Amino acid sequence: MTDNQQQRYRFSEAPIWNLNRSYYEEEGLKAWNNDQVPQYITSNPMIATAYAEMIFGLLQDQANKGNNTEPVVIVELGAGAGRLAYHVLVELCKLRDFASITLPPFRYVMTDLAMNNVIAWKEHPALQDFIAEGIVDFAKFDAVNDTELNLVASNITIGAGELQQPLIIVANYFFDGIPQELLYVGDGHIYEADVFVDYPEQADSLKPSEVLDQLSLRYEYRLAPEYEQEDFAYRNVIATYQEQLEDSHILWPSSGLKCLERLNQLTQSGFVLITADKGDNLLDSFKFAEPPELVLHGAFSFTANYHAFVQAYEESGAMVLFPPHHYKNLNVGCFLNVDMPKSYTNTRLAYHRFVERFGPEEFFSLKEWVDRRIDTMGIQQILSFWRLGGYDAEFFIQSARQISSLLPDANDEELADLASGIQIMWSSYYVMEQKYDLALDAGLILFEMDMYEQSKYFLEISINSDEDEIVSTVYYGLAVCCFEMELAEEGLEYTKKLLELEPDNEDAMAIIHSFE
């Protein structure tokens, strides 16, 4: 097809956005299985603790203002697999219960474009206690169009002006993947970069992820004087780009800005936005910027333009917090778009302590370094980093082999701390379809520690969750656990199952003969 036969699109209306939507709608929660779409960096216990601390800070601030009766609503945009929401709720409830002070009630609303995800969250075993307590709810929410929240658990609709408390908005890996415009600054003028899409052959027969992986984009530029009009809503931001940038491409977050405007209409008291993304809040990052490239991960995303949000909201009176240093993997910001933002002292202090000083970005960078050196770490180093990460399941899985090798030389205190850590980890584990079996690794480690009752508990969880892929080692371990616990009949049953997998296993045959 020649250029003049191809359709030309505004960047925000290009077919790539529909492909992105289709990917998430078709894949549902499977999109986050085994990190097809990255989720660990924005949903681990460490970042959840930081968010819970900021939310708890806002609850304290509202209590100090005497606003204790109306609930504070927390809306997570694009809640993905649900892991972040779960960890935030776990930590937030711990803080609430530990503090034992008067606070306003709260409700965490998980939202997504795909209704299948909403249904899956509502049915997830880990969230049932929170549902019963009334502190979590769910809504299908289209960030590009919707103006209200229809909560499916409580059957409540939140419409314009109905919230009296500030709305807390959580947006991780969100602004980088919703429709936006591509602008170009040249000779002091603003251009829109329209796009032509070159599709792979037989695109209609390919999955959205396959089409995205194989298509290519080409751009043509046209003057866009509407951005230079005095009545353009974000005229000052555009003027900054005209004055300080040249030969630069800018992703203009049109949908993101409008989404925040619509969410702001739900409340009488403004909002606090907590957001993390690969996103630039410094203007220097855009100087002489080339056209953006699709970052592919099943779906696609771009580097978010946080700068536009920062300037727009600071000029309207908000306080915006970003770390003073540069980021590599994840930029975490907090927007206090409320009256007298400096009066939100506890919220700001929480950001300082849990993001700015040492936060999710620093933890992830450190974890990448640790991951490459686990086989050199001692038990104390492993325990220390595990605690730092909030007894993270992924780190335990990665370090299980090294832990096993260190057990013979571990002292009683270290073994006790390890066993305690496993229990803490499991108590806040959010089950997802993953390539690893956490219960199996926990059970085998405890077996090596001669903690047979605890080992049996986890090994039985493992075999009950995946009966098609049971290895003989598990039945052997369960049999030994039962015999050590004087559960002879149960131990015999596991021994028989071991023989079904390994008919020539001499130890198992000897046990069977001893019962005859």
Roles of regions detected by a PLM:
Residues 81-101:
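Conserved SAM-binding loop of SAM-dependent methyltransferases across substrates and taxa
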Residues 243-473, 480:
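Rossmann-like AdoMet/SAM-dependent catalytic core
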Residues 99-100, 105-112:
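Conserved SAM-binding motif I beta-strand of class I
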Residues 153-187, 245-258, 266, 273:
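A short SAM/SAH-binding and catalytic strip from SAM-dependent methyltransferases
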Residues 1-71, 76, 83-86, 90, ...:
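N-terminal charged/capping segments associated with class I S-adenosyl-L-methionine
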Residues 118-161, 227, 234:
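S-adenosyl-L-methionine
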